[in-house]
Amino acid sequence: MFARDLAECEKTERRVVSPDGNWESTRLLLKEDNMGFSFHITTIYEGKDFDMHYQNHLESVYCISGEGEVESRETGQKHHIKPGVVYVLDKHDAHTLRAFKELKLACVFNPPITGKEVHNSEGAYEILE
């Protein structure tokens, strides 16, 4: 058993800020923790929107605070995001995420990430060992 403090992790390399300034994410659980998934607290800054397509990972996202929407780039279907809503990318869905108000999200990735991943040109994380 172990415990981690979000505020303490935010002071370490577990906190990652996107190169484009759209988001930041503190990775509380990573592949090295041997849980079979990774767990992150991610902030999407107000007014930001961007395309992602996790071709190598499945993701579920729970909204803690803020407001936005996620749109399927395949179907155009939109889901409103607000506190208490979970959205699930269960088919490696290409999607656009929009933050109308700053979003604070709890994210779970399977397979787990190592913490060194950055989005590639298609908005995906590569599998890193």
UniProtKB/Swiss-Prot annotation:
Record Pfam families? Ectoine_synth (PF06339)
**Catalytic activity annotated for this protein?**
(2S)-4-acetamido-2-aminobutanoate = L-ectoine + H2O
Q: What is its EC number?
A: 4.2.1.108
Question: CDD domains from the entry?
Answer: cupin_EctC
Pathway where it operates? Amine and polyamine biosynthesis; ectoine biosynthesis; L-ectoine from L-aspartate 4-semialdehyde: step 3/3
EC supergroup of this enzyme: lyase
Q: Which GO terms describe its biological process?
A: ectoine biosynthetic process
Gene Ontology MF: a single term: ectoine synthase activity
Q: Which UniProt keywords apply?
A: Lyase
Kindly give the InterPro entries that the UniProt entry links to this protein. Answer: Ectoine_synth, RmlC-like_jellyroll, RmlC_Cupin_sf
Q: NCBIfam families recorded for this chain?
A: PRK13290.1
Protein family (similarity comment): Belongs to the ectoine synthase family.
Q: What does this chain do? A: Catalyzes the circularization of gamma-N-acetyl-alpha,gamma-diaminobutyric acid (ADABA) to ectoine (1,4,5,6-tetrahydro-2-methyl-4-pyrimidine carboxylic acid), which is an excellent osmoprotectant.
What name does this protein carry? Answer: L-ectoine synthase
